[in-house]
Amino acid sequence: MRSFVRHQLWPAVALLLAITVITGFIYPLAVTAVGQVVFPNQAAGSFVAGTDGRAIGSSLIGQAFSDPKYLWGRPSAAGADGYDANASGGSNLGPTSQALIDRISAEVDRLRTANGDAPIPVDLVTTSASGLDPDISPAAADYQAARVAAARGIALDLVRQAIARHTDGALLGFIGQPRVHVLAVNLDLDGLVR
């Protein structure tokens, strides 16, 4: 029995404790420390600050905009009212789900009422996997540009310039699609962040 404890049980318990300390304490603390030093903004949540320095959003999490003077992001299925970071996730509704069909139909009606009868980009009626996507396609931004310009009483070209300033291309030129950051465009148009 003593041989079993000394040769098998004690090394197993010691290894368990060592791995617990390394992976549960040392590694997370080291990664957090490196993150705070090398990427302080990202480690703190990638907050976007207004001109007064106060956090007004995050560059990683979408927000609900419904005022006609703002670009609207993708619909969100995260939480009861959407854009709930505590309930991140898609709707899990299948393509034959009547609830999904009704939601998309209502979104199409809302967009047509606000923007006219132009073809609606698909990302304005479909949710992302997380339900918190902060970006839309350039086509979705351009689709809304005339509405935003009219609601603000500014030239359409000024809205398109703001969209162009906050459009990122594909990563490394070939990974992913070009995307427009909704919050950044809206803040730019408000003159809050440059």
Describe the predicted segments one by one.
Residues 1-3, 194:
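Short, low-complexity, intrinsically disordered N-terminal peptides in bacterial proteins
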Residues 3, 11, 23-24, 29-31, ...:
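Flexible, solvent-exposed loop/hinge segments and secondary-structure transition points
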Residues 7-16:
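Residue-level signature of transmembrane alpha-helical entry/exit and packing/kink sites
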Residues 19, 138, 142, 179-183:
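Short alpha-helical patches at coil-to-helix transitions and adjacent helical residues
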Residues 147-194:
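Extracytoplasmic/periplasmic C-terminal soluble domains
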